[in-house]
Amino acid sequence: MVVPRGQEHRAPQEVETREDEEQNIKLTEILELLVAAGYFRARIKGLSPFDKVVGGMTWCITTCNFDIDIDLLFQENSTIGQKIALTEKIVSVLPKMKCPHRLEPHQIQGLDFIHIFPVVQWLVKRAIETREEMGDYIRSYSISQFQKTHRLPEDDEFMQRKEKAIKTVTDIFEVYKPQRKYKRQKGAEEILDEESKVHATLLEYGRRYGFSRQAGKTEQTEDKKIVLPSGLAAAGKAEPCDEDDLRAAEELRIKTLMTGMAAMATEEGKLTASTVGQIVGLQSDEIKQIVSEYAEKQSELSAEERPERLGAAQQHRRKVASLNKQILQKTKLLEELQAKFVDLQAKCTEAKKTLTEVESYSEKLDKELAALETIESQADSSVLQNLRMLVAINENLKSQEQEFKAHCREEMERLQQDIENLKAEAAENGEEEEPNKLIDQQYQTEKEKLQKIRLLLARRNREIAILQRKIDEVPSRAELTQYQKRFIELYSQVSATHKETKQFFTLYNTLDDKKVYLEKEVNLLNSIHDNFHQAMASSGSREQFLRQMEQIVEGIKQNRMKMEKKKQENKMRRDQLNDEYLELLEKQRLYFKTVKEFKEECRKNEMLLSKLKASSS
């Protein structure tokens, strides 16, 4: 492979990257995100931005429990091909993680931090969430493992109290379990609908539904303190409440269900054990209060059994129901009126707002009119007179233009009507053949002209297309810049391949030389071994053999001295080239620094020019 002169020992040029302020800001934000997430290698100043960003993305992916096929050991100064292969592996894992942002390998390799930032932000968020989930899982697993082998004092205390608590709860359930108070008679009417069956079953256990709150409280007091006989329970009613006819019908239905029931034999006419215990445990004042309440209830029940009292109560309930209906109607009417009031109030507010806008616009017009009058009073009267005259002339010309257009339109309609009449007359008289021939000839002539013009237009369009293609073949500045970047990348790849191939050739030549020397050594040893016994047979042959050995040793020493000398020369040349390389690197750094300072000065110059233009304008 042929390498251009002057570039054989030159380091591969790096790919140009966007180094504007926005890219630098995004790079700083990416590094701050990675450090905040726990990737502290991003603080190392010796690493390149590519190594920091790619390392951070790889760390986030592995933290999220996703596998990525990369080398375990860190490799510095990777080639373009190695970087692209690494970025392709990273990008291939992102769809598996269901990343909502798209990213291409060349964007990572080209350090396009604007497009890399959303992906890194999402990866850091996902890594933190995964770490929290793993922390919760490890914490719960640790607690479970601890609980398998150890116990806290609270756990021991709970285990000691557990059996006693279970026994207490069981006893409470046994004491307060539902007790059947009534039983349906055998000859009672059969209940058909399911809801009535449910109510009847609940009534058998003393559960009454459909009463008011006051009635429910009275029943609870009766259940807790005393159990009345079945006749009193069937006749018991709540105090009059403000309910409608449906509630009265519900009470009537419950009473009907109660008529088909009889009290249980074990509880008829006596108190339950729990009620007796409660009464005994109460004080004397409470016992007196219970007796008075029982007397009041008994008097109310006896009063309600009278038919004349029953009619008055029913009439009172109906009046209350009708009044409730009237209250509901008035309430609905009030709500409708309130809604209309709110609507009218909104319209009034909107009208006031419109009025305010109109008044402000009127004031603005008045101010402008006053300003115009002021200007008119200050202006020259002759100029104003000329302006008024010109405005009048303009208006007059506009009106004349409208009249002329209307007159032309009428004239055109009249002429078209005349043409139609003439055509009709000519068709009747048969005198239009000669004009038709002239018209056809003129039409054919114009048609041929049109065809020629179209041919010329097509030829001109072809010429324009050819010129356009030639213009398009010349690359623009952006395309040339892109080509230059791609050529630099290709050159870097070719240079790396050339360097690698050169190393292989050097290694091959070294091994080949080593092989030649080893073969010579083996042949020499074999020759010595074969001729040793024959040379030792006589003194003359022995001396000759020793002289030959000395000559061979001398030749080997000379070859060794030559190789050492060549090695020293190569080493000196390497040191010299290394010094030159370091000088070139220093020049390159100085060049990049100068370019950066020049860009900064250009930016400052542009800002000053823009400020100068703004101040001058």
UniProtKB/Swiss-Prot annotation:
Keyword Zinc assigned to the entry: answer is no
Q: Which InterPro entries match?
A: CCDC93 (IPR039116), CCDC93_CC (IPR019159), CCDC93_N (IPR048747)
- Where does it reside? Early endosome
Compositional bias per record (Basic and acidic residues), positions renumbered to this chain: 1-16
Described purpose of this protein according to its UniProt entry: May be involved in copper-dependent ATP7A trafficking between the trans-Golgi network and vesicles in the cell periphery.
Name a single GO cellular component.
early endosome
The primary location reported for this protein is other
Coiled-coil features, chain-numbered ranges = 285-474, 546-614
Which keywords label this protein? Coiled coil, Endosome, Protein transport, Transport
Question: Which source organism does the UniProt entry give?
Answer: Gallus gallus
- Secretion signal: which residues? none
**Which residues does the annotated region (Disordered) include?**
1-20
Task: List the protein's name.
Answer: Coiled-coil domain-containing protein 93
Origin superkingdom: Eukaryota
What processes does the entry annotate via GO biological process terms? Answer: Golgi to plasma membrane transport; protein transport
**Similarity remark:** Belongs to the CCDC93 family.
